[in-house]
Amino acid sequence: GSIIWAETVRAVRRMNPNTTMETLIPDFQGVERNLNRILEAAPEIISHNMETVRRLTREVRIQAKYDRSLGVLKYLKENGANRTKSGIMLGIGERREEILETMDDLREVGCEVMTIGQYLRPSAANIPVLEYVTPETFDSYRAIGLDKGFS
């Protein structure tokens, strides 16, 4: 897994050294040697999505763990990542205070960029959309995120 990500970054650099690179990686189960491969490839942004709030992680991300994802982002930042990025989806039953807690958790591990988007159900086999979040609510979270130091 991580070898392919790192080789892809290096291949793009060889073809176009001026390309800004962002990688969106899985947690690699928190295995440091896999994370180090990504760090050694040196993309400008390393992204690993939390996907949801702590309470819903087990339901939404069957193989992932909330704290392991935070640990991955922290490890990346502490070991030389230029910028780290993460994102969550809304509309699956999360509460405002849980979203704010996730923002705080991400800032605590040094994450600089956060995206928040609307969850859209890919198929009937996936969890249903419980709410379509309004643009005004997204604007509110954007303002809060900027106040918390996200770019």
Q: Model segments located where?
A:
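Active-site-adjacent beta->alpha loops and helix N-cap segments on the catalytic face
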Residues: 2-8, 55-71
